[in-house]
């Protein structure tokens, strides 16, 4: 019997700026409603979600706005629009939590990463987040630098 291969997610796009610019609250995993050429283009790993966000519309549906999935090069005239809004697939309870966080607490829905799960499905990790002020960003940088320095000191000591 063959050994199971490790279940490593293939990350298609990551929003590394989000953890710097926002205080990340609760995270959610959502499915993405994509066309065939979008899936193929995502597998190449050239998508960008740094400037994107998600929003809940009046019908209670969540859409990913401003994410760029470039056109698939090998596709013909039936290619997709690179910046079109894409529907996110979530449970009703999760959508209610997201809309409540946005309306009452003044938070935003930020995408953290797009990846393919072990079944090959495209998933997106989104989070309710609150924007950081400049002094909060500086404080985060100081903590990170101190942790690096502390690690160096401990490593050099031993």
UniProtKB/Swiss-Prot annotation:
GO molecular function, one term: RNA binding
Major subcellular site: cytoplasm
Single biological process term from Gene Ontology: trans-translation
SUPFAM superfamilies: Small protein B (SmpB) (SSF74982)
Annotated organism of origin: Beijerinckia indica subsp. indica (strain ATCC 9039 / DSM 1715 / NCIMB 8712)
Pfam families per record: SmpB
Highest taxon of source: Bacteria
Function (record text): Required for rescue of stalled ribosomes mediated by trans-translation. Binds to transfer-messenger RNA (tmRNA), required for stable association of tmRNA with ribosomes. tmRNA and SmpB together mimic tRNA shape, replacing the anticodon stem-loop with SmpB. tmRNA is encoded by the ssrA gene; the 2 termini fold to resemble tRNA(Ala) and it encodes a 'tag peptide', a short internal open reading frame. During trans-translation Ala-aminoacylated tmRNA acts like a tRNA, entering the A-site of stalled ribosomes, displacing the stalled mRNA.
Family annotation (PANTHER family): SSRA-BINDING PROTEIN, TMRNA-BINDING COMPONENT OF TRANS-TRANSLATION TAGGING COMPLEX
Name of the featured protein: SsrA-binding protein
Segments for region (Disordered): 133-158
């Amino acid at each position: 019997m063959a050994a199971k291969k490790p279940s490593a997610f293939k990350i298609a796009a990551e929003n590394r700026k989000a953890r710097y610019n926002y205080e990340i609250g609760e995270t959610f995993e959502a499915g993405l409603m994509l066309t065939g050429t979008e899936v193929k283009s995502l597998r190449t790993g050239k998508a960008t979600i740094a400037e994107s966000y998600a929003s809940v519309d009046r019908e209670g549906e969540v859409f990913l706005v401003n994410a760029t999935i470039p056109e698939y090069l090998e596709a013909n005239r039936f290619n997709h629009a690179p910046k079109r809004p894409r529907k996110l697939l979530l449970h009703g309870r999760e959508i209610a939590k997201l809309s409540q966080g946005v309306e009452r607490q003044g938070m935003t829905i930020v995408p953290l990463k797009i990846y393919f799960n072990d079944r090959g499905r495209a998933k997106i990790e989104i989070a309710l987040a609150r924007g950081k002020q400049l002094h909060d960003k500086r404080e985060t940088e100081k903590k990170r630098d101190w942790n690096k320095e502390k690690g160096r000191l401990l490593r050099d000591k031993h």
